[in-house]
Each structure stands twice: as C-alpha cells, then as structure tokens.
C-alpha cells in the first residue's frame, strides 16, 4: 500500500512537471514565433517607403489629417509604389495596392482574420461579422448567409419603396428650392429601412413606435476608435478603462444592447401570437429561427449581429447614396441619362419599382459603381496573414498585418485613367470585361465579401431613382467639391450640398 501511494504521488508529480514544461515550451515557442514574425516584418518595412512617421507613434496621427484621403491615400501608388509601409505605433503594417497582389490575400480563407484593433470596435459593433474572426466568423456567416438569398431580398423592396416615399415627402415639405445637405436626409431614410429590415419596425405603421424609434440609440451611436488612435496611450486597455471616454462607450453599448433585446422580445411575441404572417419578415426573425435550431447561436450573438447590421449598414449605405446623388448633381449629363433610362423603364406609369425594374437600371448602376469607386464607404480594411504570402515583388511573413485600401486601389491610373474624374462608362460591360476582378473593392472581396452587397445596391437604386423621378438635382454655388475624411467609413467634411427643383414632367405622381 505504501509503495502504491508513493508511485501514485510520483506519477502525479511527473504529470504536473510534464504539463508545466509543456506550457513553458509553448510559451517560448509562441514568443519566438511572434518575435520572428515581428523582426521579419520590421526588416521588410525598412526596405519599403511610406508616409513620414513619428517615433513611437508611427503614422497614428494620420487619423487626425482631414486631407488624408486626397493627400496620402489617393496618391499612395505614385508616391510609394505597390507596397506601402505604415507604422501603427511600433507595429509595421503593409498597404497592398495592386489587384494581383490583393487577390492572393483576399481570395484565401487563410487570411480572413482581422488585426488587433478591430476589437476596439466591439463596444460599438459588438463581436459580429465585421469584427469577429476564426470559427465564430465562419459559423455565423454560414448561418446568416441564406437570409440574403436573391428570393428573400425581393421581399425587402416594399421596405425600400416605403422609406424612399417617406424621404420624398420630407423633402417636398421642407427642402425644395433650398440648399440642403442631402446626406442628413438620406441617413434618416436608410435608418428607416434598417429599422424595418433588421428590427422589424414598420415604416408606415409605427404608431406609438415612432417616438421609440426617434429615441433609438442607433441614431446616436458614436465610435471611439479614431480618438484612441489620436491618443495612442488609450490603445492600452489598462489605461483606457479609467477614462470618461471608456465609460461613455460602455454606457452606449448597454443602451444599444438593451434596445436590441427589447426588439428581439417584441419579434418573439409577434411570432408567438401568430402575427408574423401579417408583417414583413425581418432579419431578427431569421436570426431567432437560427438560434432555435442552433444552440451555439445565442441571444448575445443575435444582439451582436443586429448591432453590426444596424450601425455598419447605416453609415455605409447612407454615404453611398449621398455621394451618388451629389456626383449626379455635379455631372448633369449623367443625371439626364439616368432620367432617360427611368422614363424608358416606367413610361407613363407612376408605379413603384419591382425587382425587374431595378435590374433594368443599368446606367444608374454604372453611376453608383463609379461613385463607390471614387468614394468607397469603407476606404480601409485590415487583415492578419495566416501564412507566408508571396506577392509580385515581395514576400510577407505569416502573421504580418496588411492594409487593403480600396480608396487607393480605385485610383490606380493604369487601371482607371484620369482617376479623379466621374466617368460611369468605366463600368459598362465592354469596359469592365478585361478589368481585374480585384480592382474594384467597394464591398471587399473573397470569403469576407460583404454579405449585404446586393441588399445595398437594391437599396441605393430605389432611393436614387425615387428622387430622380420627381426632382432635378442642381449644384450649390461654392459647395461643389468633396472633402473626404476618414472615420472608419468615408465621410464628406462639411456635408454634400444640393438644390432640388421639381421636374416639369415628373416620372411619378405625387
């Protein structure tokens, strides 16, 4: 008995020793691998050029540069070449600009992980499709993707039409003939669409819900990440945690999450009362059904994904619509071609558009794509490489951080001659046929291609066509240029100003 206890104790001690040695060995290996990747990235960065950087801060202060997009990103290829060195604090990043190189990275499932600073958006977007990585991202993508099937998207057209009509009525009541920042009105319209399409709050039948949605935290959301980069010490969570900014962000997250949970409860009650068939099905309904058949998809996951769609969809689509309308204002010949196309599609009818009508808006789609080329809603994407990548001129080590900059790639003169000019014909079938598929990235590309891209294009077409059928868009003297600024999504500093004039022969009855 004594001998058996000694042997048992010895075996346990040996097992503990082995486990401790294993943990130490793995820690040493991880440290060595991380250090090796870091040193290789630093050595490569020293052979590349990029914008001037500051000691310790690197290029973080570029976030404060209101002229960053035009002065730096728009001319990146001419200034620095196809691979640009960027320092984020003491960490080297590589901005990849050429479509051939981008395809190597974006098309591979091995490079779908996001870099460390995406977690800074968790208190804003939650841990949803935009910010998550690994198995969580791939599982959620697989589960949610069917909700954006072509046949289901068609059911959202009535939502787009109702919101567009509401936008028209608001403009007709207070904006015709005056100078307006069209972005403000468009953003409200897009939020109306998302309220119904994502949360299930009908646009025309809100009743008591109107006040509730007017106070919606999704109208007031503010992302703190850019401010943390301008004060890089706040990138350290141990310091940031004690700031007023962090407290405000946590309170904002609580408001967003609590509000979304109320919406989930509301949709569950509607489903339980068998009233679901009387209302348009929304994304929350789909996600509730997913959670009922997949235990791993929890209510917290529904909240995170709903916040992602509400907040990301609001900024990106709102900007795309506003930029498109503004550019049509500055290019009246393109606006006239869009109006002629709409007259051909609708003839003398004042009916709302169908899915077929939206597909027939081919020239308008060219205009939308050209607006997205010039002003992509998300001008910067970051990825962490899962393995070594050989590009045309350089090799990037596994684990290194890369930037994909659609704003810069969309301005490569050897792909888009005279890149600052608005030319929708670039996207005609004959002109697009031989263009590299990764030369146009408004919705990213590859496995992480934006899940809502077709939803967004349909939404934009519906809003733009509704306004063009009733109004002529005119420029505002002294406000004919765009000062693009980068705040995660692309914004127009100072707004996008237009004048609306009632058409003598509107293409739709009022």
Curated annotation (Swiss-Prot):
Q: Is Metal-binding set as a keyword in this record?
A: yes
What are its GO cellular component terms? endoplasmic reticulum membrane
Family per record: Belongs to the cytochrome P450 family.
Which amino acids does the record list as binding heme? 450
SUPFAM superfamilies with a match to the protein in the record: Cytochrome P450
Q: Which domain of life is it from?
A: Eukaryota
Task: Kindly list the cofactors needed.
Answer: heme
What is this protein identified as? Probable cytochrome P450 4aa1
Task: List the EC numbers from the record.
Answer: 1.14.-.-
Question: What's the main place this protein lives?
Answer: endoplasmic reticulum
Q: Which InterPro entries does the UniProt entry name for this protein?
A: Cyt_P450, Cyt_P450_CS, Cyt_P450_E_grp-IV, Cyt_P450_sf, Cytochrome_P450_Monoox
Q: What membrane topology was assigned to this protein in its record?
A: Peripheral membrane protein
Q: Does the keyword Protein biosynthesis apply?
A: no
- Keyword annotations of the record: Endoplasmic reticulum, Heme, Iron, Membrane, Metal-binding, Microsome, Monooxygenase, Oxidoreductase
User: What is its subcellular localisation?
Assistant: Endoplasmic reticulum membrane; Microsome membrane
What this protein is reported to do is described as: May be involved in the metabolism of insect hormones and in the breakdown of synthetic insecticides.
MF terms in GO = heme binding; iron ion binding; monooxygenase activity; oxidoreductase activity, acting on paired donors, with incorporation or reduction of molecular oxygen
Stored PROSITE patterns:
CYTOCHROME_P450
